[in-house]
Amino acid sequence: KLPGQSAVTAVSAFVAAPAVGVFMTDRLYHENVYTHKEACCVATNFSVVSLGFFALLVTITDTQYMYGKVVISSLVIVFILAAIVIRIPPLSRKKDRYYNGVEQTAAMRKSSKYSKDTMKKAVAASTTKVSQTPYSIFVTSIPGVLSFTVKIVTFVQALATIALFISNYTPFFDWIGMPMVPYLELCQMPDAAAIAPATLVGIAEIALPVMTIAGMNIAPMSIFFVIVLSTVQIIFFTESANAMMQSDLNLKFPELVLIFLIRTLIAIPIVAVFAHVLF
């Protein structure tokens, strides 16, 4: 369903930040590598947080020993969710049209299967690509990077301040988390009432779920659940979602909220299974 170049987004996000993954996806869309549908699917499914941010999340809850489990579980679940979410509206209804307006045909879709020669071909292709890339591309890319950065930074600062204020000084997130308690209890998660708000606050800022439970006397399984869930939700408006809205992918606020809710509802039982197996 997705081109192999989607690995570029995942790697960019893992080593840098979700916004970098979105930027790379937007750029590949501009270069007519992705169709609009492919770009939207890649951005909303593979713009994961960086490995460094994973470390920050486990540090906040003083559970550094979980780092390996959290990273591997999140990576696996991200791919499971991607296979499901891209087949559900609104992503399934996006047009297979390139940036230049050309409709993608069946003949244009490259069907490739993994084989023992795949890695060798990938290394050869990457080496060829690097050798053909002029150094001037780094200079010509600077204006685009700066423009994209300016677009999202001001919005991020404003939204992060508002989100933190609402989380710390109002019961708003506690209220919206209440309907999730029965769902978490159905998944047999310990401390369901305590972690329920953390399942939804991540739409504002990815660190909020972990900050919500930090210092609470809850089971390690529940801590693992909250950390992994927050990282696989992908959509949070202080960075990734904001970057998507500022890109040319034309993803609207209501669409991103809907994708967040879909990802969350599907991810909860999957993450719960991982939590029960590992703990």
Language-model segment annotations:
Residues 1-47, 214-221:
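Hydrophobic transmembrane alpha-helices that form the pore/transport pathway of multi-pass ion
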Residues 10-20, 169-171, 197-208, 231-237:
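Short helix-coil transition sites and intra-membrane helix breaks within transmembrane domains
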Residues 35-85, 207-279:
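C-terminal transmembrane helix pair
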Residues 38-44, 126-127, 195-196:
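Short, amphipathic, aromatic/basic-enriched membrane-interface segments that mark the entry/exit
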Residues 91-146:
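Intrinsically disordered, low-complexity non-transmembrane regions of multi-pass membrane transporters
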Residues 128-218:
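Transmembrane helical segments that form the transport core of multi-pass membrane transport proteins
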